[in-house]
Swiss-Prot record:
InterPro entries linked: PRibTrfase_dom, PRTase-like, PyrR, PyrR_bifunctional
Recorded catalytic activity of this chain's protein: UMP + diphosphate = 5-phospho-alpha-D-ribose 1-diphosphate + uracil
UniProt family annotation: Belongs to the purine/pyrimidine phosphoribosyltransferase family. PyrR subfamily.
Superkingdom as given in the UniProt entry: Bacteria
Gene3D superfamilies in the record: 3.40.50.2020
Stated role: Regulates the transcription of the pyrimidine nucleotide (pyr) operon in response to exogenous pyrimidines.
One GO term (biological process): regulation of DNA-templated transcription
Keywords annotated in UniProt: Glycosyltransferase, Transcription, Transcription regulation, Transferase
GO MF annotation: an example: uracil phosphoribosyltransferase activity
Enzyme Commission (EC) number: 2.4.2.9
Motif window: PRPP-binding: 90-102
Protein name: Bifunctional protein PyrR
Encoding gene (name): pyrR
Classification via Pfam families: Pribosyltran
Length: 172
């Protein structure tokens, strides 16, 4: 199975997001990307939407509930939100939705900054492996992978998807 082209997915996601926001009468959303791939997707999506407003970035490393199992990512950086969260309509963007734990961590962090009016979740890919009841409002594509496979977004320019085989990596 070949992987979809991120640029094609983002073009369609922009159409879908525009419709989603219009149905809810949201005219000035604030974009937030989850590091690192979610930031790249958010930048491309915001550009496709013709929106040049400041974008926020979240690093959810300290908010993950699997921190004690997986350890801390070696490149933790501070989150940057150049706008108030309180009362804002947020578009939260991630590259790959797998378990849902990253999104849960992102929501926890966002609520530490204030209470948003709404949060629209946008994901490039859903791997249909959810452990939590989290589903995106706007989605590029759903992929079904074998248990030993993962998908990684590379970028920032151009954005590309690559399949990774964890079984072959552990054999090394």
């Amino acid at each position: 199975m070949s992987l979809p082209n991120p640029a094609d997915l983002i073009r369609q996601m922009a159409v879908d997001l525009r419709a989603h926001l219009a149905r809810r009468a949201i005219t000035e959303p604030r974009y937030i990307g989850i590091r690192t791939g979610g930031v790249w997707v958010a930048q491309a999506l915001q550009e496709a939407m013709g929106d040049s407003s400041p974008m926020g970035t979240l690093d959810v490393s300290f908010y993950r509930d699997d921190f004690s199992q997986n350890g801390l990512h070696p490149q933790v950086r501070p989150s940057e939100l150049p706008f108030e969260v309180e009362g804002q309509h947020l578009v939260l963007v991630d590259d790959v939705l797998m378990s849902g734990r990253t999104i849960r961590a992102a929501l926890n962090e966002l609520f530490d900054y204030g209470r948003p009016a709404s949060v629209t979740l946008v994901c490039l890919l859903d791997l249909d492996a959810g452990e939590l009841p989290i589903r995106p409002n706007v989605l590029g594509a759903t992929l079904s992978l074998a248990a030993h496979e993962r998908v990684k977004l590379t970028g920032p320019a151009p954005l590309a998807l690559e399949r990774q085989d964890l079984a072959s990596r552990s054999a090394l």
